[in-house]
Amino acid sequence: KTACIAGRFFMGDENLSGNFDGIKTQKFGVEIECTGLTRNAAARAIGRVFDSVPEHFGGSYDKYHICDSKDRKWAVVYDSSIRRVDKNGGNASREYAVEIVTPVLEYSDIPLLQEIVRAVRSADGVTGAQYNCGIHIHVDGAPYTAQSLRNLVNIFASKENFLFDMLQVSPMRETYCQKVDRDFLEMLNKEKPKTIEAIQKLWYRGDMDEVHHHYSSTRYKACNLHSFFANGHWEMRACNSSLHAGVIRSY
């Protein structure tokens, strides 16, 4: 039952129950927040998986790029929300705030993602709600129509209590992964918008300029459509962070 619900979430299609072919063709990306090691150490750990030397670009996010065998760029960046610790659990500098950002992935890349997670954990990476860390899954929005986007929101809203229980979402993280806004849901089902633009107007309560604000307050939803309107992919923010390869695969 859980797997069927997940399939419907990812494809936004009510007819996918029991059919996982759609999931296997869905493109996605993942952001994993962690600490216990520096960004440089995390980048080097990922580089060892690919036999690749990280490039340090710096900037406000202190970005590192690591190329894989398909010339895709994996990134390690700074995230200010993380509670930073060193490998001994003591308070640490901002160098220990680590966010791993994957390139666009496919189903066949999941074992590779698991290998990356194992490498970071072996390099002293730690994570979890106690460090204010989460995992964000970005799902390609290209297949979505206004109807399937409405379906996504309604399925999510109807099952989110179950999902929060199943995923054991920490109360410490609920500020950053709020449940579906009930006013938005009510207007969505009352007006039944026929276009993506009309749904966007409801999401931003008429303030269409909000789509250009990266840190829009609307982004802190477990089912984040700000990411869809701004970048073309919706975001699932309800997953507690983990560096356990099996947990990553289950997400």
Show which residues each predicted segment covers.
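Positively charged N-terminal leader segments that act as targeting/secretion signals
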Residues: 1-10
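C-terminal accessory/tail domains of diverse enzymes
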Residues: 11-129, 142-251
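Short, conserved phosphate-binding/catalytic loop or strand-edge motifs used
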Residues: 131-135
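Histidine-centered divalent metal-coordination motifs
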Residues: 136-140
